Amino acid sequence: IDSGFDNYAGVTFFGTEERILVGWAANWVYANNLPTGEFCGQMTLPRVLSLVDTPLGGPRLAGAPVSDRLFGEPVPVSGSLPGEVYKLTVSGEGEAEISLSNSLGEAFLFGVDGTGDIYIDRSNSGARDFDPEFAKPEYGRISAPRFFDGPWTLELTFDRSVCELFGDKGTRAFTQLLYPTEPYTSIDIKGNARAGISLIK
């Protein structure tokens, strides 16, 4: 359901027209030491589940975020980010990397690599020394192969300290916690890709 580091104990709802799943955006390995101050723990976006037939992986469980009901229409991105809560849609073909960064040089990276894998990299995304496990390299970067050939679209929803990345019609999802020292204000795209951004309604 999710290839990221921080999605745990997902539950679905009974009596709804759609099969909706919500998870706990955390990881038991370091959940007790998160540098969030006034709160501890948050939930993922609700996701509508479905089966999608993929050319490279056969039938796959997909989760489409219901954020379309929360966010407005996307507008082109010109290099700067509008705040700490937004949805970013990136479309491209082949290899590309998207970087969200701040003035301190901290950056969260995601994209499609040269082997065709979708990946996220929070190795230099901000505070990581609050827990020895969180700081380990194995909790920095993760990737997963695509289930589709050709052009791709990635949707990333960012909400202050949690971001959720969806690709290949929701058959790939990555949930991860990030703790930038100050908000990300810049976006940079390398490769054949373009982006649009949507704000919460």
Residue ranges and their predicted role:
Residues 1-201:
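Beta-rich accessory regions
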